[in-house]
Amino acid sequence: MGVACYARLTGDESCTAQAKTMAAHLLEKIGDKGNTPLTLDGQGWSMKYNLLWDKVLHLGLLPDSFYAAETASYLPRINTYGLPLDSRADYTKSDWICWTARMADDPAVRAALIAPVAKELHETTSRVPFSDWYDTKTTRLVAFIGRSVQGGLFALML
């Protein structure tokens, strides 16, 4: 992603081609059927929130079919209060859920990802400014209080 962004900023077409080649190699390893692994050895899973910028900046690194399959693969993993960051724990980051929702073109997938974040905000027992890092099963605050990263909640407006 970073290589493609710098290539665009500098107008370096060879660097753009290199970024697209790297993305193509990645797709060869992981496929475009969704459910990409947490690590390249195929273990676990994770939200691919940083891929948001491929969609927002129209870099064209990965096909729309990849994003549709990947975001749909998250739906069965959503807990009461949101999608965990990855398969290692039940905590999440609300801003990154919104980044992930922005990658989905399907409004139903977006809504399914966003609704639990709103539910957490309404039902949390934590009496602090909106924490971006919380447990998706209990709403328990993990850390981080009232941080500016919550601007990521507006990712759907990009």
Question: Residue locations for each model-derived region?
Answer:
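Inter-helical turn/loop segments and adjacent helix faces that build the functional surface
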Residues: 4-17
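A structural signal for conserved, well-ordered secondary-structure elements
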Residues: 1
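Non-catalytic carbohydrate-binding regions of carbohydrate-active enzymes
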Residues: 14-50, 57-158
